[in-house]
């Protein structure tokens, strides 16, 4: 899987002379953004304990928000790197599909981004991860306003910020009696997933599940 990821990055024309995580030299063009030592750390690391998330029946996490995985997520988001987002999706694909087969959701979706973020990046990174994983999804959410990034916000500030997540009016009828899986990149305080789950349940969804690429420590 690691070699596949490296080849995908190279195939996309994305290759640097130094590893963007540790700065070590990259000797092979197949390595793309990361040295071999760092790529070896790109493996699932499920938390030993899952804290309860309000309105969410169950959820899964691929790994910890640290090291190479954290760098990959940040690079995909803030380097506006759609190919890297899709490549990361391919890495997590087997684990995401395993969970999908277990819960058998009727509908899979992910958070929306506001217009400011969309125009600065040119894409929604979680949508591109799902495309990379080969997972069909429906755009259920939108985000209003021009708020900045949520990283570094306090819990109270996050609770206010997540109010900008709304449902798309045209899909509300699709949610009634549906089992919904929400995919997101990082689980931190749980404010975002709680808001999204509450929204879909409020219009008749039967159950909400979640999958996160990483969980913050």
Question: Could you tell me what each predicted segment is?
Answer:
Residues 1-217:
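Glycine-rich phosphate/pyrophosphate-handling loop used in enzymes and phosphotransfer proteins
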């Amino acid at each position: 899987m690691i070699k596949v990821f490296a080849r995908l990055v190279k195939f996309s024309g994305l290759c640097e002379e130094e590893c963007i995580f540790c700065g070590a030299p990259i000797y092979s063009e197949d390595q793309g953004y990361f040295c071999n030592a760092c790529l070896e750390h790109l493996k699932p690391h499920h938390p030993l304990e899952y804290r309860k998330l309000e309105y969410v029946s169950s959820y899964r996490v691929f790994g910890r928000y640290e090291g190479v995985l954290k760098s990959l997520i940040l690079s995909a988001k803030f380097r506006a790197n759609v190919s890297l987002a899709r490549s990361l999706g391919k890495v997590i694909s087997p684990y995401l599909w395993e969970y999908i087969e277990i819960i058998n959701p009727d509908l899979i979706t992910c958070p929306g981004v506001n217009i400011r973020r969309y125009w600065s990046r040119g894409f929604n990174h979680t949508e591109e991860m799902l495309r990379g994983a080969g997972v069909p999804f429906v755009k259920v959410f939108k985000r209003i306003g021009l708020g900045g990034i949520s990283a570094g916000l306090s819990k109270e500030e996050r609770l206010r910020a997540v109010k900008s997540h709304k449902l798309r009016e045209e899909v509300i009828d699709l949610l009634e009696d549906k089992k919904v899986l929400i995919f997101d990149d990082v689980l931190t305080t749980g404010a975002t997933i709680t808001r999204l789950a509450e929204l879909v349940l409020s219009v008749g969804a039967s159950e909400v599940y979640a999958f996160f690429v990483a969980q913050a420590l």
